[in-house]
Regions:
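Aromatic- and Gly/Pro-rich donor/ligand-binding loops
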Residues: 4
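Recurring C-terminal helix/loop segment of individual leucine-rich repeat
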Residues: 28-31, 72
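A positional/structural detector of protein chain ends, strongest at the extreme C-terminus
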Residues: 230-233
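Buried hydrophobic core positions in alpha-solenoid tandem helical repeats
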Residues: 1, 41-43, 82-84, 129-131, ...
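Core helices of alpha-solenoid repeat scaffolds
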Residues: 34-40, 75-81, 118-128, 165-174
Length: 233
């Protein structure tokens, strides 16, 4: 009921933040939160909530979406239908939280039909969101997009793979990926050459990981070219 206190933004934020913290603490709590109907209330309220409340709601959803066992329930509730419009929110936090939730849901899902259902709608759908985030200058957004795209491409769902391959923006996706690789390599080639002997113990940079993931996407998207069925220019 606290989620419904629309006249008190601070109370709503506090209630949802508490739910998020509870969800993060155990799988049992995640299940209890979903069983209590919290996700359904979030779905009903989030699109019309203040930005601060949207931020908390999408962050909570992203945490819940980490559960392998509970993903089917979240997807069956139609949560993607409200997350997708929020990836284009005026708030960077809401955008990032919504995209993170979609990414978590896309990883090792049992059924990818809910992703096919939102391929091009609402608000440009899954495809529009991926293109928008690949074009972003924010490396966190780029990483979420390329990682999510790999989950979808490797899902084994033929219909979803065909959506990606048959998209009129397939070449645009490919060019965005290739651009990320080229930009990263040109900017870091000299530094990598001069410091190669000293980097073995360092963490992989976000840019390097994006480039590595992008190469994998490029391989998958254009693997048909190896069979002599390259895209028309």
């Amino acid at each position: 009921e606290l989620l419904s206190h629309e006249e008190n933004e601070e109370l709503q934020c506090h209630a949802i933040s508490t739910l998020r913290n509870l969800a993060a603490s155990s799988e049992r709590n995640k299940a209890a939160i979903i069983d209590a109907g919290a996700v359904e209330r979030i779905r009903e309220l989030v699109l019309h909530a203040p930005l601060s409340v949207q931020s908390e709601m999408t962050a909570c959803t992203a945490v819940l979406a980490l559960s392998e066992d509970l993903k089917p329930q979240l997807l069956d509730m139609g949560i993607c239908e409200v997350l997708l419009p929020l990836t284009d929110s005026p708030s960077i936090e809401v955008q990032g939280n919504s995209a993170a939730a979609l990414g978590n849901l896309s990883s090792k899902a049992d059924d990818y039909a809910p992703f096919n259902a939102v391929w091009d709608k609402p608000a440009g759908g899954l495809h529009g969101y991926l293109v928008r985030f690949l074009e972003s200058e924010d490396t966190t957004f780029q990483h979420i997009a390329v990682w999510t795209l790999i989950q979808l491409l490797e899902s084994g769902n033929h219909e979803l793979e065909q959506h990606l391959r048959d998209s009129p923006h397939r070449l645009d996706l490919g060019r965005q990926v290739q651009s990320r690789i080229g930009t990263f390599e040109s900017e870091h080639e000299q530094a990598d050459t001069s410091t190669a002997a000293d980097t073995s113990g360092q963490d992989v940079s976000p840019e390097r990981e994006i480039a590595a993931l992008s190469r994998r996407i490029e391989e998958i998207l254009f693997e048909e070219s190896d069979d002599g069925t390259s895209d028309a220019k």
